[in-house]
């Protein structure tokens, strides 16, 4: 299981790149200075038109990690309510190599 860094020291509200998720279990990890920011793992069931939060376990207001299980979809990280000193990084890993790609 390898981690892919999908967010590198983000300092503004916005979204990471979109990643194709084949299917199965994974893990999201976020770290950094939050300063009021909220970080959410989101999925799109329709190739990027609609985005919904994966769940409360993968919504962060402080550094942490969470497991998730989703069917084939696109994934991204959403950051909102950043503060003056917010600087956040995030990683996603898959249970099986090759389950995630740009």
Q: What is the meaning of each model-derived region?
A:
Residues 42-45:
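Conserved Ser/Thr-centered positions that define the repeating blades of beta-propeller domains
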């Amino acid at each position: 299981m390898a981690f892919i860094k999908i967010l590198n020291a983000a300092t503004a509200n916005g979204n990471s790149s979109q990643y194709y998720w084949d299917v199965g279990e994974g893990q999201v990890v976020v770290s950094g200075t939050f300063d009021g920011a909220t970080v959410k793992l989101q999925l799109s069931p329709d190739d990027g038109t609609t985005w919904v939060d994966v769940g409360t376990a993968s919504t962060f207001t402080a550094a942490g990690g969470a497991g998730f299980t989703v069917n084939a979809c696109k994934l991204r990280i959403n950051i909102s309510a950043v503060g003056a000193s917010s600087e956040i990084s995030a990683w996603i890993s898959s249970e099986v190599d090759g389950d995630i790609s740009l």
